[in-house]
Structure formats: C-alpha cells, structure tokens
A protein has these predicted regions:
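Amphipathic alpha-helical recognition patches that constitute DNA-binding helices
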Residues: 24, 58, 69
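Electrostatic cytochrome c docking/interface patches
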Residues: 1-28, 120-128
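Flexible coil segments in periplasmic/lumen-exposed cytochrome c-class electron-transfer proteins
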Residues: 7-8, 30, 39-42, 46-47, ...
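Sequence/structural segment immediately N-terminal to covalent heme-attachment motifs in c-type
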Residues: 19-42, 75-76, 96
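Short Fe-S-cluster ligation motifs
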Residues: 62-77
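Amphipathic, alpha-helical segments enriched in basic
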Residues: 4, 8-11, 34, 49, ...
C-alpha cells in the first residue's frame, strides 16, 4: 500500500473503494483532520482561527492533488502538519484519501451531477 510505484507517486487508490472504506475515512478525517481543516475541508475551524503563522489550507482549493500525493502528506506531514502515520494505518490513510476525494466532489457538485432518482428525492426534500 505504498504511495509510490516505480519511483512515481500513484494516481489511483490501490485498494477497493467501498462504502465501509468511505465511512472509515470519514470517521478518521473527523477525528484527525477536521480539527484543523474543518468538517468540510474548507480550512474553517476553531483551531484554524488560532493559527496566526499559517492557517491550514482549504483542501478544495489545492489543485489536483492525486491520491498518492495526499497519502504522502498524511504519511510524512507537510509544512506545519505533522505525520499521521503513527496514528493511522496505511489502510486508514487510504480511507481518508478516498473520503477526501468524495468530499472535494461533494463541495463542487451541482444537483445536475446527481443521478436522476437522487435529484428527484432532493427536490422533494429541500424547500424552495
């Protein structure tokens, strides 16, 4: 479960992305990442307001972070962010990567991006 293959950072998640993996990723993100990056990854959190030197980035504004790059940052740390390898197994780190990909898509998505049956359900549930 390395983030590098033949010296290159991998561009796909090397394990099956399942609902259980996504739920694990969400749980671990909420415990270890959201405290600084915010629950939706926008860099808005109570801790971030106290970080005068350099606040955590809005994860949605980072240009095309491939899965291997995100895994590497979680594993090794970056800037003021420490490594989370001691707290998260490789499987859990890939789960966070998978969840972050879904989170990014959810924040940039529109109703038209959802399948027709989901669009219909959302239109019925959301008041206008």
């Amino acid at each position: 479960m390395l983030f590098r293959s033949s010296g290159r950072i991998v561009d796909t998640i090397p394990i099956a992305v399942t609902k259980d993996l996504m739920l694990l990723g969400r749980t671990k993100f909420e415990v270890y990442c959201a405290i600084c990056h915010g629950l939706v990854g926008d860099g808005v959190s109570l801790v971030a307001t106290q970080m005068s030197l350099r606040p955590p980035p809005n994860l949605h504004q980072i240009r095309n972070p491939g899965p291997g790059h995100v895994f590497q940052v979680i594993t090794e740390g970056f800037g003021l962010m420490p490594s989370y390898a001691p707290q998260l197994s490789a499987h859990e780190r890939w789960a966070v990567v998978a969840y972050l990909q879904a989170l990014r898509r959810s924040q940039a998505g529109t109703l038209a991006d959802a399948p027709p049956d989901i669009q219909q359900k959302l239109r019925a549930e959301v008041p206008r």
